[in-house]
Amino acid sequence: MLQKYFPAVADLPLFMPLRDAYILPDVPAIGNTLTEAKASYCSFNSLPPDAEERFKRFSESVASHYSGASNNWAIDGQHTFNGRPLLANDPHQPLNSPSLMWGHHMNSADQGGDLDVIGFGFVGVPSVQLGHNRYLAWAATTNFPDMMDLWDVEVSAEQVKIGDEWIPAEIRTETVKVRGEEDLIFDVLTVPGYGVLLPDDVAPIPLVFFNHRILFNWTGFGPTHEAVGFHGFDMSESLDDFEYYVDLMEIAAFNFVGATTDGISYRSSPLVPDRGMPSDDQPHYRMLDGGDPGTIWTGNYLQSFQLPRCRGGDRGWIVTANNDPFGFTSDGLLDGDPYYYGVYFDPGTRASRIESELTRMINAGPVTIEQMQTLQDDTYTLMADDLIPLLESAYAAVYTDDALAEYRDRDDFDSLVELMTNWDRHMEGDSSAAVVFNAFCFFATREAVGDDFGIIFETVLSYEPVYMIKFAIQVLTDRISNAAEYLPDGKNLTILRALDKTVAYLNTQFGGVDPSGYIWGEIHGTRFDHVWADGEGIGWVATDGAAGTVNVSSSNFFRYGVPLARLDATSGAIHRMVTRFDEDGIPVSQVNFTPGNGGDSFSPYFENTLDDWVENHYQQLLFDDEDIQGNTVESLELRRDITEQ
């Protein structure tokens, strides 16, 4: 779609990160500079006349599918206060009420069984997905291997052209039962061995020509062993056990990090098609030509030595934050990579911040639990490190560059530049500078690349702001050599226009630029919607953080081109957990989670943990039976009625 309708966007370094922060140790920094991006501007004349309205509807339809971003890290005992590993995890999910995950403890071991495990699981799903047992603690973030492809294929009657062959298609009927209503019937057109044909209206604008369809294939089209793998974690006694069960999972595209008292491990083993040598001439992250036999999957997959895995390396720590495991994306190119794994990873701001903070902590002395907890709550925005120096430089040129003359003698500019220059760059609730920077960042993004993205600008921005901001920063900081082609009026004028729009926003929203009139916590927070449309959710609470910070609280700024009065995050850390090991090698966890462990809105446990989550206060996750019995406030015993057998 990009290359067809928005060529200037397609030629941007779409997957080059903002920071050289990669999961595996000893990955060299390539430099975050792409030689050239081709700024071939498009008039969008080929778009349907109602394309803008279509994208608005599409943006609304996908908004609920984004689950945010996650962090985990592990530190080997050589760097910790007690000589044993530390593990941290804050998985990000949609924040609903009741919660998608719940805390639970399963113990059959005391009665001769195999289980003694505690942590969090998705409601209705067996096993503890994230937590610890008596030996092992484990965590996960989402990895982004490319496990699927799209092809533009020619169709005729009930046949599909794959390479040089016409393959018969088959219709499979899927029935979805809906309580109290008629069944929903779907006819799925499959091409055996090659995938399924997507509906014609899957995208808001046409992507293929007449008599063509989009063929979709995914390595998960078949039975897989994720349930076995997660249950295996619950019973694992060593890192070898942990790694064995990771390797059983075919489509669990997660960065699994495990720890025992003996060490730490990072492992991910998804089924990724082996597509041969990668090439920018035929990139698999774009739609492929189904008539080219060379694009069709061969049935081979990347081998174990090509997948992410390590035990901390010489540095003795592991960080994952949805970032590139290998560093293949560093130059924004596929050519020269040893194989193709994927490209659409996080821009690296969270991973970079965590890595720099861990390095600082380790250099200063043994790392403590409290330091791990503080890092989970970190709201420093690295994007300010990119944009504020540009603002300072542009404003310093106002009186020497006549092209900027309209911005001379602006007291409001003086005030805002000084405010952001002296700011600590933390997106905290009591910060007025955070309000100003957030607005300036979004306006600068729109000024820099909004015209290139055209009607899809807000769709991409609303799905995940940090990606669109990444593109703008790459242009504004000259990370592509021909960045000036994307800024026809010059960098300084672009920046000051964004500041001028920030002033207008502050005047409209707060009656002026005086920082005493606004703080981040009054306009930014998390909205907890009920999982049922007619249910009563918790509502809105002020929360720290923003897009791209370790404590992620990502919210959009625009709606239909107009700044929003309130900025709502709807996803975030569904729980935060930090785990140490006691002298007997048993994991001990400190945790906070939201909104509560009860699913009934009338329950006293429906939102009783919300305040601790907002303030990042931790409590021990009780695991020892004596501690549990001593703190039990309510119990329910279920017994099987053997008289009915």
Question: Where is each model-derived feature located?
Answer:
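Long, compositionally biased non-active-site segments enriched in small/hydrophobic residues and glycine
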Residues: 1-46, 260-645
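Substrate-recognition/specificity elements adjacent to catalytic centers across diverse enzyme folds
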Residues: 1-86, 91, 97-98, 123-127, ...
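Active-site-adjacent "gating/activation" loops or surface patches in catalytic cores
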Residues: 63-69, 78-85, 89-100, 205-225, ...
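Glycine- and hydrophobic-rich flexible loops that cap the catalytic core of alpha/beta enzyme folds
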Residues: 67, 106-127, 131-290
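Conserved structured core elements
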Residues: 69, 85, 95-98, 132, ...
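Short, well-ordered alpha-helical packing segments
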Residues: 72, 76, 85, 92, ...
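Primarily extracytoplasmic ectodomains and periplasmic/lumenal surface modules that are beta-strand-rich
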Residues: 81-82, 93-95, 136-138, 145, ...
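Generic recognition of flexible, low-complexity loop/linker segments
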Residues: 60-63, 71-77, 83-84, 114-118, ...
